[in-house]
Amino acid sequence: MATVVTIRQLLESGVHFGHQTRRWNPKMKRFIFTERNGIYIIDLQKSLSYIDRAYEFVKETVAHGGTILFVGTKKQAQEAIYEQARRVGMPYVNQRWLGGMLTNFSTVHKRLQRLKELEEIDFDDVASSGLTKKELLGLRREKEKLERTLGGIRDMNRVPSAVWIVDTKKEHIAISEARKLNIPVVAILDTNCDPDEVDYPIPGNDDAIRSVSLLTRVVADAVAEGLMIRSGGAPGSEKGAGEPLAEWERELLEGKTEAAGEEATPAAEAPAKEEKAQAPEEKKEAGSGEEA
């Protein structure tokens, strides 16, 4: 199989930065490489193998006619979810998850039909509509609300074959609904998450914009490859290069997990992160988005 993503790309996107050590789920211990300045560092060798596994699942699911629902409503994920899902023609939810979106899909589908009916109305043609300006205004507002909440799944005619989740803690309702319907969950697992909730986990940073964007792009690439296989095309692959790595980052790159307990040189240490509640920056990388 061609290289899906390199460890260098994961490092440069900050995928390895976990939460502060006091904010973790012990079930994530097996995915943790070491700790630096009170922050857990995720083992990217394991992330890489789990990415390959998730990639193959998504690719095969789509190749056999399946649909992947992209879900990420936190600020750091909204743009990536929107762009990547639209790039590969998949449904998405990036604003607000409505309870019952999966478990009560028959009702949701009726609202989608209502949205399509409203889209047929010419709100600027008052004369031929047979409605008053006030009535048209009310219908326009109804349409805008439906577009905002359901626009991303406008063309989804049945529940998806699988869901891609950014931040399993924030999207716990979506995960709960998917599990009730036995819909496979593919998701980023940060160090504070529960791996038992996810079928195809990707250990990584679910708060940094670059990390979320990279991993969501990888999932979208898997969808694209699956679509090409479905249509009989020949998929390609991408590779990346980067800057020199710090010593402790090279340990990750080389898979030296036995070095987890060793001290890094001052220049090699990751900068300490503050609690997200105390700072507007993301917990993991300078210049990233805010916590949703």
Curated annotation (Swiss-Prot):
Biased segments, Basic and acidic residues type: 247-259, 271-292
Family: Belongs to the universal ribosomal protein uS2 family.
Origin species: Thermobifida fusca (strain YX)
Record's GO cellular component terms: cytosolic small ribosomal subunit
Domain of life: Bacteria
Entry coiled-coil feature ranges: none
Region (Disordered): 230-292
GO molecular function terms noted in the UniProt entry: structural constituent of ribosome
Protein name per its UniProtKB record: Small ribosomal subunit protein uS2
Pfam families found in the cross-reference section: Ribosomal_S2
Entry annotated with the keyword Hydrolase: no
Record PROSITE patterns: RIBOSOMAL_S2_1
InterPro entries per the UniProt record, alphabetical: Ribosomal_uS2, Ribosomal_uS2_bac/mit/plastid, Ribosomal_uS2_CS, Ribosomal_uS2_flav_dom_sf
Keywords tagged on the record: Ribonucleoprotein, Ribosomal protein
GO terms (BP aspect): translation
